[in-house]
Amino acid sequence: MKKLMILLAVCSFGLANAQHLGTEYRLKKVVEVPGRQGIAADKDFFYVSDTRGLYKFDHNWNLVQKRVQTKDKNGKFIDPLFNNPDPAKGGANHFGDIDVFDGKIYTGNEYFNLGRGVNISVDIYDAKTLQYVESIPWRPESGQVEVSGVAVDRERNLVWLSDWVDSRYVYAYSLETKQYYTKVQCRPEPYWCQGIFIVDGTMLLAADDGESTYHIADNVYKMDITGAPFTGLVQGTEPVKDTPWSVKTDKDGKVVKRTGEIAGGAMGGRVELFREMTDFRRAGEIEGLCIDPVTDDLLVLNNRGTQIILGMSQGPFKNEGYTKEIHEVYIYEKVK
């Protein structure tokens, strides 16, 4: 009987600390944070990513730990932060949205400049120390050209990646094998997807599809990803891309093709509007999102106050009194 009671207590604790998606949320609180990219939560801490930084807060939003890329006056790294901080040698300069699971922080890393990403990888950090642990290598054969967000599918032991440049697909890798698993087509496309999160078999997608210049709100969408099958990479032939939306041609105007490993297939997903973010203090650039496993609150990070061109801040809206970009986490309580 004693063992049964302990087992029931453990199960109850697990259920109490598992995220569940609601259908209606109400703004409860706004917290200014030092990072502009991503937000994640476990039962003890909140985690915020900046382009070149990681921050950890307790559940009262007191900063308890941080790691920021720093250099000395000669440009030598004091703390490189990234496993490989040299873009010239295949390194990264950019964190996107993040997730935390089983004591590890999952980050999407790349070298990002004016709307294009290269040198992509999923780099995993220890949530206790904020130190690098290992990487999951990117497979460009999947078709992915940028990584804006990372989300762990806790039920299927997968990690999913979003693509800001070409948001038609989201891509999955196995946490067990560290290999490419499958991709899902987002229909209709939530363009400029900045962050994702998975709960109850549903993917939430934060899309920077508004327009800060015109005060048009960004949106959060949802998509059922249950049943996405393994497709992997297979041997095949496909056109060579010139850009994500065009193909290369030879001197005779014929499409250039390549033979080798290509994506073995995909599942079609159905994207629905989950929430229009009209209650942001100002339309800006939506970023990462997550659900607090303790409270079931929805947390969404938004940047405001600067004009955004191709995913990069181009200076403040001085005519509105802004002198810098402001990063805020919007906390929404679940109504039902």
Where are these regions (language model features)?
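Sec-dependent N-terminal signal peptides
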Residues: 3-13
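Beta-strand-rich domains and repeat architectures in extracellular enzymes and scaffolds
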Residues: 26-55, 94
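Structural motif
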Residues: 53-58, 114-123, 167-172, 212-228, ...
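Surface-exposed loop and turn segments in beta-propeller and other repeat-based domains
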Residues: 20-28, 64-91, 132-146, 183-189, ...
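Short coil/turn segments that connect the beta-strands within blades of beta-propeller domains
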Residues: 43-44, 102-103, 155-157, 200-202, ...
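Short loop/turn segments immediately following the C-termini of beta-strands
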Residues: 51, 110-112, 162-166, 208-211, ...
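Repeated scaffold domains used in trafficking and secretory/extracellular systems
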Residues: 33-40, 75-79, 89-99, 142-152, ...
